[in-house]
Amino acid sequence: NKILECLYKIYGDFDHLFMDEIQNIDEWFLFVNRLLRTGMHVLITGSNAKLLSGELATHLTGRHMKIELYPFSFKEYCEYLDKSTAHGTTKEKGLLRAVFDDYLHDGGFPELLNEKRKQTYINTLVDSVMKKDIEKRYKIKYKAAFENIANHLMNNAPSKINYSDLQTLFGLNSDHTAENYVSYVKNAYLICGLHKYSQKSKIRIRDEKAYTVDVALMNNREN
């Protein structure tokens, strides 16, 4: 109530409210639901897939719309840099390949495109996600093992995900813990899992591979 009072004092009347990473506040949904009942348009942003899927559906009354934003695709990368995607002539193909090489190295994080210290930016981003978004939220007990698993998956992408191997490699008590840690890294949008195409469900489940959500997480980090 005090926050709302201050907002009304500063901005006057308003009907849209943005909230970032509100899932870190206990029982945040009680406050949001109260705002929704007054007709307020509430926009919640966060970097955790669990919030965007399960928690919104569970805790918020009425309708809500989920929008997932990812780093730039190559087309968006070209549009942002005002680069032509034409590739009809030999010259156009050569120019486009040069831009594509840059994209494969630098990735599609918008903030990174104008950042000179790319490695520093990515290292800070990943460190913040692991320590603030994951370790704090999930109360990670074995922090060193978790960070080693996350870095291992990003540094070796694409690679098959084998929970028993991860358990042994990083000295965990069970492969279930390793599976949980991998799911946390996925939920934080550092990696995504891709299953092998097959008509047989056993093969699809068994042969999942880990990919970074953006190539910058492989190419612009201290390994």
Regions found by a protein language model. Give the residues of each.
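Conserved catalytic network of the ASCE P-loop NTPase/AAA+ motor domain
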Residues: Y8-G12, R34-H41, H59-L60
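Structural recognition of the conserved hydrophobic beta-strand(s) that form the central parallel beta-sheet
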Residues: F18, H41-S47, E68
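Interdomain motor-coupling "hinge/lid" segment immediately C-terminal to the ATP-binding subdomain
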Residues: S47-A49, G54-K160
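Hydrophobic helix-cap positions at the C-terminus of alpha-helices
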Residues: L7-I10, I25, L35, N156, ...
